[in-house]
Amino acid sequence: MLTERQQELLDFLRVYQRQQGVMPSTRDIQLHFGFASQTAAMSHLKALERKGVIRRLAGKARAVVFPEVMERETVDIPIFGLIPAGFTADNPEHSDGNLTLDLRTMGLSPRSKPFALKVRGDSMTGAHIIQGDYVILEQRDPRPKDIVAALMDGETTLKRYLVDNGQPFLRAENPSYPDLIPARELMIQGVMVGLFRPYNGR
């Protein structure tokens, strides 16, 4: 999955090549985005290369090309409306349909067992996650500040995962909601890695 800045850079490369017939230099990229140095521009190009959306040719100026054929790894991942207690992504019969995603562009492996959760409520609006969105999650151990789908004391919720003095708790991205401190159990069911927002035509 590309960051907002990486997507802006990729779009700039495409437009520049279409209009100028060549790729921009690192100096062109630096000036366009206001980077402090050409080294910063190169760092962003390397990030795009690591994610497989461009290729750089060694020893050549303006040596950025788009792969003629992108290797795609498109799969259907299950959508869960309300995650049932104890669910796993190995039980697609509990799902509410599927989303078709290219895992390569998101930096995911099928082994991570990605799945989608349809958002309900307004507790995560501060993270720009609104009702009707689909959050894409993978099954792995969370790191502090990750947004997670968690089963806490028998109920499932989407919140930010935090740790204080070794004690994990969950925090909404909306000041109207209190922190959630587990009384008995806290099971992380997935860590958010992306978001899909359906277009409603408005």
From Swiss-Prot:
EC nos: 3.4.21.88
Catalytically driven reaction(s): Hydrolysis of Ala-|-Gly bond in repressor LexA
Keywords of this entry: Autocatalytic cleavage, DNA damage, DNA repair, DNA replication, DNA-binding, Hydrolase, Repressor, SOS response, Transcription, Transcription regulation
Site (Cleavage): A85, G86
GO BP, sorted A to Z: DNA repair; DNA replication; negative regulation of DNA-templated transcription; proteolysis; SOS response
Pfam families (UniProt xref): LexA_DNA_bind, Peptidase_S24
Enzyme class: hydrolase
Keyword field contains Transport: no
Residues annotated as the enzyme's active site: S123 (for autocatalytic cleavage activity), K159 (for autocatalytic cleavage activity)
GO molecular function annotations of the record: DNA binding; serine-type endopeptidase activity
Keyword DNA damage: yes
Function: Binds the consensus sequence 5'-TGTTC-N(4)-GAACA-3'; some genes have a tandem consensus sequence, at high concentrations their binding is cooperative. Binds to the promoters of a number of genes, including dinB, imuA, lexA, recA, recQ, splB and uvrA. Represses a number of genes involved in the response to DNA damage (SOS response). In the presence of single-stranded DNA, RecA interacts with LexA causing an autocatalytic cleavage which disrupts the DNA-binding part of LexA, leading to derepression of the SOS regulon and eventually DNA repair.
Subunit note: Homodimer.
Family, as annotated: Belongs to the peptidase S24 family.
Entry protein name: LexA repressor
